[in-house]
Design a protein with these regions (language model features):
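Membrane-embedded alpha-helical bundles that constitute the cytochrome b-like, heme-associated redox core
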Residues: 1-218
């Protein structure tokens, strides 16, 4: 039985969640930036009007949190740090040259992707908590003004960190050829998998061999 030239990298449900977050994050980030910079008030037109932007901003933020928590449950076991992350970090120069397969036996996600995962998840949690504290007219009146001021500062700082993290994530997705295709179509070439995630590719091969063996016994 000949092997397919491609393998499944990302299931449909995960791709749907990813692109839902992408769209919502764009709307939330754009509207959030406009709140802090009056000269960029026109950015709120993504929601129709400035008033609608202020109303919908937190609701879209909550939607992002819910979807990301669903993704957290699905991906956390792949993002636990392991000993293979150490040589990857130490060999970052070779990694940037495209030779990561020479420095570490990378699983489904490399050390950089794991750091990105935990950064995004931690920042979205902080943004939710601080966002609830400053959310008018529903929750802000339950907190003293000093708490709201600190929450605003932390919320803005976390948002800046998250926006930069997402920009890095986007750059790396374009930089590593084949990555975006995996998130759009859900599949990557065997060569891509073997080069960038050799340990994960071996696991996929083992599962394929086991499946073929089971089917052959029927």
């Amino acid at each position: 039985m000949s092997k397919s030239k491609t393998i499944v990298r990302t299931k449909f449900v995960d791709r749907a969640c990813h692109w839902t977050v992408v769209i919502c994050f764009f709307l939330v980030a754009v509207s959030g930036i406009s709140f802090f910079f009056p000269t960029l008030q026109w950015l709120t037109e993504t929601f129709g009007t400035p008033q609608m932007g202020r109303i919908l901003h937190p609701f879209f933020g909550v939607l992002i949190f819910v979807v990301l928590m669903f993704m957290f449950v699905r991906f956390v076991h792949h993002n636990i740090p392991d000993k293979q992350d150490i040589p990857w970090v130490k060999g970052i120069v070779e990694v940037l040259k495209g030779n990561e397969h020479k420095v570490a036996k990378v699983g489904k996600y490399n050390a950089g992707q794991k750091m990105m995962f935990w950064t995004i998840m931690s920042m979205i949690f902080v943004l939710l908590v601080t966002g609830v504290i400053i959310w008018r007219p529903y929750f802000a009146h339950y907190f003293p003004i000093q708490v709201i001021r600190y929450a605003l500062l932390i919320h803005a700082t976390s948002a800046i960190i998250l926006i930069h993290a997402i920009l890095i994530h986007m750059y790396m997705a374009f930089w590593v050829k084949g990555s975006i295709k995996g998130m759009i179509e859900g599949k990557v070439s065997r060569r891509w998998a073997q080069k960038h995630h050799p340990r994960w590719y071996r696991d996929v091969e083992r599962l394929e061999a086991k499946k073929e063996s089971t089917e052959g016994m029927k």
